[in-house]
């Protein structure tokens, strides 16, 4: 049986650490990638097609899309939805980066045997604790794992282990290089956070210089000089970093409008009456997205949770929804095409008059408003074909 390894990723954006991860994996590599909205509650810096192209250029064989109701979820639900998609495509292994060197297969075995007891333990914990805090206490209680508060990949890896329990998937943890959310562009392996910050900083400086020299600015979010980041990005995809990009600033006026005029925010996914009141009050004074998050979050409602809630509000995600039955393909190599042939009835390669997932497609329409240079994200788009593998 051929080894087929799944990777769950955002590639926001793709960098040398991601290239390193792909290079450590043998056999066929299937990536389940977030579309245009991220797990931490933010729009992707580059659209899903650009990021899929980056992944294919650096060794992925098949890139499929996580629907927005999976990609913008908390860790456990994000992991569960992504693992289910990959398992449906026949993966034998799941690879991921982690700051920890523990055996995640043992963790999955523990959860398979004691999962019901572990979930009951979470329910017994005090309500004032956030869900991530409850989850960490659960892992500590049943496995002895310790957390230092600065291991986000380790937290996700535990969610993957939980999602993979009982599914006959071998878990392959690859030691992470570089710091996950470091804001500094260190030599070699820079974090996605640092790259996003640097990209927008460079763009602002470029636009200021352009205006000072009386040159026309066709788009405020296009970067042409990539020399400052070339040492931190795989050479094969450096040019793609000049693609149109966006961030929350582009959507904040839309979000303000939505919060102000919607009299029933509690009908939005995971928004309750308490949060609705807090949001209605905070939006009157918040000058930007970060200020709004700062004013709304509490110990119980973490910043990450608030960012996701604001994403649900902007995208009008209802409390009840169904996940799409088919899997949307963004791109494939020659090897990946063989996997598609084996899963013909499970995949959708082109979205036309018959929709794939209405919520994701509407979310993509809103995403397109973030930059006038974004192309149509779904209707008529065909998967990217890579000739590399």
Curated annotation (Swiss-Prot):
Belongs to the TmcAL family. This is tRNA(Met) cytidine acetate ligase. Its EC number is 6.3.4.-. It is found in: Cytoplasm. The keyword Ligase applies. NCBIfam families: PRK13670.1. Its main location: cytoplasm. Keywords: ATP-binding, Cytoplasm, Ligase, Nucleotide-binding, RNA-binding, tRNA processing, tRNA-binding. One of its GO terms (cellular component) is cytoplasm. It comes from the Bacteria. InterPro entries: Rossmann-like_a/b/a_fold (IPR014729), tRNA(Met)_cyd_acetate_ligase (IPR008513). It is an enzyme of class 6 (ligase). The keyword Protease does not apply. PANTHER family: TRNA(MET) CYTIDINE ACETATE LIGASE. One of its GO terms (molecular function) is ATP binding. SUPFAM superfamilies: Nucleotidylyl transferase. The lineage of its organism: Bacteria, Bacillati, Bacillota, Bacilli, Lactobacillales. It comes from Lactococcus lactis subsp. lactis (strain IL1403). Catalyzes the formation of N(4)-acetylcytidine (ac(4)C) at the wobble position of elongator tRNA(Met), using acetate and ATP as substrates. First activates an acetate ion to form acetyladenylate (Ac-AMP) and then transfers the acetyl group to tRNA to form ac(4)C34. It catalyses: cytidine(34) in elongator tRNA(Met) + acetate + ATP = N(4)-acetylcytidine(34) in elongator tRNA(Met) + AMP + diphosphate.
């Amino acid at each position: 049986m051929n080894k087929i390894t799944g990777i769950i990723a955002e590639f926001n954006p793709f960098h040398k650490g991601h290239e390193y991860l792909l290079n450590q994996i043998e056999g066929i590599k299937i990536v389940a990638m977030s579309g245009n909205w991220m797990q931490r509650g933010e729009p992707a810096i580059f659209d899903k097609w650009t990021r899929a192209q980056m992944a294919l250029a650096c060794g992925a064989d098949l890139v499929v899309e996580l629907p927005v109701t999976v990609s913008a979820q908390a860790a456990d639900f994000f992991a569960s939805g992504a693992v289910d998609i990959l398992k449906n495509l026949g993966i034998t292994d799941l690879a991921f980066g982690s700051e920890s060197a523990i055996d995640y297969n043992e963790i999955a075995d523990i959860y398979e045997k004691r999962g019901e007891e572990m979930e009951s333990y979470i329910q017994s914990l005090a309500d004032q604790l956030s869900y991530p805090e409850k989850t960490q206490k659960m892992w500590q209680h049943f496995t002895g794992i310790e957390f230092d508060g600065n291991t986000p990949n380790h937290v996700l890896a535990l969610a993957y282990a939980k999602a993979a329990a009982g599914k006959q998937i071998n878990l392959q943890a690859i030691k992470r290089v570089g710091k996950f959310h470091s804001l500094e562009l260190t030599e070699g392996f820079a974090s996605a956070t640092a790259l996003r910050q640097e990209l927008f900083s460079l763009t602002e400086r470029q636009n200021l210089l352009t205006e000072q020299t009386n040159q026309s600015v066709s788009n405020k979010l296009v970067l042409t000089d990539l020399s400052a980041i070339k040492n931190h990005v795989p050479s094969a995809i450096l040019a793609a970093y000049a693609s149109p990009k966006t961030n929350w600033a582009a959507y904040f006026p839309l979000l303000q409008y939505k919060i102000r005029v919607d009299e029933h925010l509690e009908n939005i996914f995971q928004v309750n009456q308490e949060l609705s009141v807090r949001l209605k009050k905070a939006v009157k004074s918040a000058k930007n997205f970060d200020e709004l998050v700062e004013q709304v979050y509490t110990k119980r409602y973490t910043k990450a949770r608030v960012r996701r809630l604001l994403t649900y509000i902007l995208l009008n995600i209802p409390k009840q929804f169904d996940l799409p039955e088919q899997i949307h393909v963004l791109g494939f190599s020659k090897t990946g095409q063989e996997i598609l042939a084996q899963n013909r009835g499970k995949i959708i390669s082109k979205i036309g008059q018959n929709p794939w997932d209405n919520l994701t497609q509407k979310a993509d329409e809103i995403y397109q408003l973030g930059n006038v240079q974004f192309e149509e994200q779904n209707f008529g788009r065909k998967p990217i074909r890579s000739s590399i593998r």
